[in-house]
C-alpha cells in the first residue's frame, strides 16, 4: 500500500485551507444504512443508555478536560456532543494539572457507566488513586453534582434493581458484586461478594442488565484477543453461565502499530520504537468492550469499541440477534460477526434525522467559549489563555518538551484521512518561546516556531528518532500556516507549512503513527505554546483552525453507472462468469465481457451484480462453493449489501444468508457465498477490488 499512501498524501497536501464547517464523517449513508465506525475518531469504553426515544453515550476521557464526554442521539447512528460531566479535575493534586513534574497520562478518569433512575442521571467512573466517582444531574446537559465515593471499585457497571437495591459489578477475571448506598456516599460495608470466580474466562468492562427477570452481564476479555462475552443468571449473586457473543470481527482491519518505551513521559532523546503490526494479528482490533440497548419497538443493538490503529479506540454499532436466550451480535445467518454497513435501527427518527457529525471540528475562535470538540491536556491554568479578538491566545509557561507543556489544547484526530490546518501569529513571542501544531502521543511530534533572542526558526520535531529539522524563516507579517496531513487507515502522516495560507510545502519526512498504553489515547491534534528557558514568556495566537476530510463524503464510492472488473484482493485475479454458469477466477489479462460487471441500485444500500453479458449473480443453495451461479432472470438475482473500504476495496454480503461472497486463495474452488467476513489482512478471499 506504500505507493497508494504516497499518492494520497501528495494529493492531500495540495488542498487549500479556507475556514468553513466542512463535511465531517458521519456513519449515516443517507440511504437508510450506516457504515461503521460510528465516529472515525476516538471514543473509548462506551456505555449506552436509552431514556424514552433518546439515547445517551458516555466515554472515557483519561487526562483531558472537560471530562467524561456525553453524546446524544435519536437514531443510534447520528450523534451530537451535548455535555461533559466536569470542566476540570477538582482534586488537590499537582499531577492533574501537569505541575512540578507530575502527570496523569492515561490514568485520569475512565470506563464510565451511565444510568437513569427516578428522574436523575447517574454516571459512575474511576479515577486512578482517587477511587470511585459519581456524577448526578436532573438533566443530561448538567450541571452535574460530583460525589467522591472512594473505594477500589473500577471498570464497573451499576444496576438499580426492582427491589430498590443498587448493585455495582466490577473486577477483572474474578468478578465481584457490591451494594451501593442510595445517597451514593459509598459502597455498603461488607456486601462485596465474588459472583464469577477466576478461571471462568471472563475479563473486565462490565455492563449489567436485567431483562425479563434474568441478569445479563456483558463483558470483554483480552486473552489473547479482545472478544465479548455474556454471562447470565436468575440471581444477581449467581451462579452464572457464560457464552461468547462476538469474536474476530475486525471489519478487515489488523492490529495497530504499537509504541515500545521503558518508562512513561521520558525526555526527548530517550529510546522509543514502534513495533510494526502483523497484518494477520487481531489483538484488540476486533469489536469488543461495550453495551447493548433496545429500541422502543424491541430491536436490540450493541455499541462496542475496537482498537482502530493510531486513531485510538472508536465505537461501532452492531445488530443483536437473540438466540436461545443469548444476545448474539450479528445477523441470523452469521451470528458472532457484524456487518460494517447495515440497515439503520428501526427508531421513530430513522428516516427523518439529518446526517451529521458529533462535533464541529473547525473553529475560527470567534465564540465567547471554546467549542465542545476541544479538550485541554490536563487541567489548564485559566489565567494563561483567552479568546481575544477572534483568536485563541496561549501564554507560554516553562516546559522542557511538548508533553509537559501546560495549556495545550487538543482534539481527537479524525480518519480515515484528514488535513488539519491552523494560522499562527507569533509577533508577541519572547526569547525561548516555542509554539505550533503537534500530535500529543508517545512518540509525539510537532511543527512550529522557536524564538531565540530575536531570531525565528521554523522547526519540525519527531520524538521517535529524536529528529529535528530547523529552517530559518522570515515572516513579514508574523504569520505562518501549519498543517498536519494524516492517512490514519495506513498510520502515516506528515507536517507542512505555508507563508501565505495557499501554497504549502512539506516539512520533515513522513512519519509512522502508532497507538500506545501510556496516554491510552490515539492521535491528538494539539495547539501549544511553552517556554524552553524555564520562565513565563510571551504569547502565541491561533486562528482559522480547519479540519478537511477528503473521504467524509462517501456518495461516489459505489461504482454505479460504471462497468468494471472485480479483482480478488487475496489472489490478485479477476472474477470470471464462466459459460458453465459458475463464478471463478481467470488470467490477469482476461478482459472479456465475462470479466466485467455493473452494480444496480435496489435502494436502502442494496445492490445486485450483473455481468456485462447480461447474466445476474445469485446463489442456488446455501452459498457453498459452486452455489454462486448466473441467471438471465433478474427476479432471481441475489441482493447484496455493499460493504465499502473507501479505496475501491469492498465486500458483498448476501441479504438472504448474511454471508459474504468470496473465493479461497488456496483450494481452487469456485466462488461461494459462505464467508463470515474479512480476516485482518483481507487475504482470505472475501475482500474484492473494482477497477475500470
Ranges and model annotations:
Residues 7-12, 230, 290, 382, ...:
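A residue-level detector for conformationally permissive "hinge/kink" positions
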Residues 1-7:
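Bacterial N-terminal signal peptides that target proteins for export
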Residues 20-557, 594-598, 637-641:
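Carbohydrate-active catalytic/glycan-binding domains of CAZyme proteins
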Residues 555-692:
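Lectin-like carbohydrate-binding module/patch detector with strong preference for beta-trefoil
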Residues 11-19:
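Hydrophobic h-region of N-terminal signal peptides that target proteins for export
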Residues 14, 86-92, 614-617:
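Short hydrophobic interaction/assembly module
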Residues 9, 45-46, 69, 134, ...:
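Alpha-helical interaction segments
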